[in-house]
Amino acid sequence: MVTIKAVFDNDTATNLILDGDGLDGFANGAKLDLLRAWWAFTQGTAAANTGDCKIDFVGASSDVTALFLSGTGHYDGSAGAIKAAATNTTATSSDIKGTTRGTSGFVILEFRKDEAYA
């Protein structure tokens, strides 16, 4: 299991929130499946701010959205894990990024390593 917490303070950016090749047992092409998530977000102060956060699995040519979050909530995993569907066989194959638009708050993400991890 891998659990991370990302905190945002009136942030409008794309942030790498998990650098997967730094995890124990990483091998190129290894993936992380999203098991559970908890979040609480509010909108920033600028008029164009939305107060949301998009969580992506980083892909080789395009990223794949895992969750699009706003407000307060949780995903308890009872519907099953959200599989890492990004096509990637390089050192970024387990990377996770978050994109925010005028967002303050946090997200806690719990992942499971796939069988490619040693």
Tell what function each PLM region has:
Residues 43-69:
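Short, surface-exposed beta-strand/strand-loop-strand elements in extracellular ectodomains
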Residues 31-43:
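A short beta-strand element within beta-rich, extracytoplasmic domains
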Residues 12, 28, 33, 90-92, ...:
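Repetitive beta-strand solenoid architecture
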Residues 1-26:
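Solvent-exposed, flexible loop/coil segments flanking beta-strands in beta-rich domains
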Residues 81-106, 114:
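Noncatalytic modules at the cell exterior or secretory-pathway interfaces
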Residues 14, 49-53, 105:
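Short beta-strand/loop motifs in extracellular/secreted proteins, especially
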Residues 63-82:
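An anionic, turn-rich surface loop/hairpin at beta-sheet edges
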Residues 117-118:
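Short acidic DE-rich linear segments
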